[in-house]
Amino acid sequence: GTEVQGMLVSAEYSYDDLLRISATAWKIGSYDANSPATITQSYTYSNYEYEGEGNEICDTPLIHSVTTSKPDGSETLYYTYDERGNITYIRRGVSTVVCRYTYDSLGQLTREDNSVLGKTYVWTYDKAGNILSRKTYAYTIGTLGAVQNTVTYGYDTGNWGDLLISFNGQSIAYDGIGNPGTWNGSALTWQGR
């Protein structure tokens, strides 16, 4: 198990015949092993067909639904995809839309309408596909209102065009082997190399 905010958390996984996760059981509790709370998630899959590079038809299983069962009840979320396999809707039950996602012609996420968080997020990208900004608005599925928050991303314009050098106006410095060394006044350390 792992300790999260003073609580012991452990997970058990079940798999189907295709070795996909079919269920997860999370046991959450204090160090009293006799009374942990259990949250389970069960997954169902549906096949998504698309045309591969050689014009062959490829079949990819995508998550159709996730049912979460807790001591106080259960909830099922259903996933809908576009022709590229991008999630377009997450629904609670059959009809209540929880999240709606919009993509550009390159398959980059450009908008998320999230009714649970009460927010709509809009992303912009540069020509290389790097995120330039994420703007936050009050939740809407229609015309956007006033911007509530903007997060910006800055990149190296020299040799390595997709190297993130700033996040939300704060510089990111890298060490000699490419690991971030400082950000927002904090020193970052790396182990294992």
What are these regions, as identified by a protein language model?
Residues 1-193:
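Acidic/glycine-rich beta-solenoid
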